[in-house]
């Protein structure tokens, strides 16, 4: 079982360092490949040890950066752990558990980690699960939904990278048209499994 860790950054080096530190502590898995896609548009940026660095010059935006990462995956990769540069983990992440659910159900496009409520609507509801609860169905150990393929921290099979990387809504539509659904790890009453720390984007960055 070969899993790639793919990290996307738009040049927010302070966030990225927090994300990588948290990943080193909480993603205890022997990744077969570690990619850092630098979409800052800078020729020189933060270069952590142990990562293959791919720099987009000029920058391509989020969807383009994801496509860059997908295009550089090794041919023998089975799964991708997707991580943007503004998330940290409050506790260790059980990646083999995520793999187990994906292998058991080929219709699952991803198992994601749910984050804390972020938007005003989410904060008022109390969690992402309570905002439109009819969209989420509890399964044994995971939560099923057909609403959105999320770019929040998640694991997906490499087959998903055969699609063209696009914004979440467009990629979701393409996957749903092929019968895929999406999942979150754990239970509806769990505490957040990842924390979004990105209160700002880099200047003039496009999604």
Outline where the language-model segments fall:
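Cell-envelope/extracellular polymer assembly enzymes that use nucleotide-activated donors
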Residues: 2-4, 33
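Short, well-formed alpha-helical segments that are part of the catalytic scaffolds
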Residues: 12-26
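Acidic donor-binding segment of Leloir-type glycosyltransferases
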Residues: 24-55
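Conserved donor-nucleotide/metal-binding helix-loop-beta segment in metal-dependent transferases, i.e.
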Residues: 92-114
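Glycine-rich, basic loop-to-helix element that forms the pyrophosphate-binding segment
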Residues: 57-72
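C-terminal catalytic/acceptor-binding lobe
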Residues: 137, 146-207
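Short beta-strand-to-loop element that shapes/binds the nucleotide-sugar donor at the catalytic cleft/hinge
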Residues: 111-125
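Short beta-strand-to-loop acidic/aromatic patch adjacent to the donor-nucleotide binding site
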Residues: 77-88
């Amino acid at each position: 079982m070969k899993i790639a860790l793919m990290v996307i950054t738009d040049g927010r080096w302070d966030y990225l360092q927090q994300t990588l530190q948290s990943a080193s502590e909480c993603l205890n898995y022997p990744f077969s490949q570690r990619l850092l896609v630098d979409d800052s548009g800078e020729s020189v940026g933060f270069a952590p040890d142990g990562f293959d660095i791919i720099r987009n010059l000029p920058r391509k935006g989020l969807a383009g950066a994801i496509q860059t990462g997908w295009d550089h995956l090794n041919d023998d990769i089975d799964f991708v752990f997707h991580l943007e540069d503004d998330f940290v983990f409050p506790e260790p992440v059980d990646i083999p558990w995520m793999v187990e659910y994906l292998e058991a159900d080929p219709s699952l496009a991803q198992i994601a980690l749910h984050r804390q409520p972020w938007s005003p609507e989410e904060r008022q509801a109390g969690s992402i699960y309570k905002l439109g609860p009819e969209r989420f169905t509890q399964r044994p150990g995971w939560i099923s939904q057909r609403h959105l393929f999320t770019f929040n921290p998640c694991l997906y099979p490499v087959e998903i990278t055969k699609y063209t990387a696009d914004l979440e809504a467009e990629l979701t539509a393409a996957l749903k048209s092929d019968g895929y659904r999406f999942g979150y790890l754990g239970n509806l009453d769990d505490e957040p499994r990842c924390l979004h720390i990105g209160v700002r984007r880099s200047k003039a960055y496009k999604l």
